[in-house]
């Protein structure tokens, strides 16, 4: 089985080494094609106005000056043009990708691009806490990732579905189990705009995050609830985002 690994944290990110280790537990035919620079939050961005620069950093290891989407296309359509990959793994992201993160995540986008190309694809992310922010518990992903992937692959991933896996911020032996979940929703009040000024007094801005008190517990069955209970969250996400239920209502209203 030929496996293509990518991420959004960049070619030198610790999590990329983790996903490669997970991949090697499944196959010895592992290829890494990852962004030259950190691409966190770029979502499913595709480089159309800038050329892609490709650099071989080692055997079967390539850096692309582009997005995770660019990397998967470059890997599947150029580097591995002679024999396409059988599986795409994107991650392991430093930090969870749950709830609304799904829309912003370059990690998930890398897996989504694999799905678009007709390849079984998985996004993997490791949650951290304030205490483990500088040293996420990568051993949790290493310990549980291979077996979860084996079972999910055996189940047969539908062609238009990507699997989003999030590992809880706890030691491997503290993981409560594996839970198949749905995408959660959280209070977006933590987003803020931070205004600053440069040396000439001109304003510039950062999108930032601030800690807010958690009032309500996450809804049962969601990715958020699973991680809070120390479960590995496994969420099947569909490429087709059509709201079928509302489509019928809208058709009656507009028809």
From Swiss-Prot:
Instruction: Report the GO terms under cellular component.
Output: cytoplasm
Q: What domain of life is recorded for the organism?
A: Bacteria
Q: Which InterPro entries match?
A: SurE, SurE-like_Pase/nucleotidase, SurE-like_sf
Which chemical reaction does it catalyze? Answer: a ribonucleoside 5'-phosphate + H2O = a ribonucleoside + phosphate
User: Which cofactors, by name?
Assistant: a divalent metal cation
The entry lists its GO molecular-function terms as: 3'-nucleotidase activity; 5'-nucleotidase activity; exopolyphosphatase activity; metal ion binding; nucleotide binding
What keywords are assigned to this protein? Cytoplasm, Hydrolase, Metal-binding, Nucleotide-binding
Q: What is its EC number?
A: 3.1.3.5
Q: Which residues bind a divalent metal cation?
A: 8-9, 40, 93
NCBIfam families referenced in this protein's UniProt entry, alphabetically = PRK00346.1-4 (NF001490), surE (TIGR00087)
Record function comment: Nucleotidase that shows phosphatase activity on nucleoside 5'-monophosphates.
Q: Name the family.
A: Belongs to the SurE nucleotidase family.
Protein name as annotated: 5'-nucleotidase SurE
Q: Which organism is it from?
A: Rhodopseudomonas palustris (strain BisB5)
The gene name on file is: surE
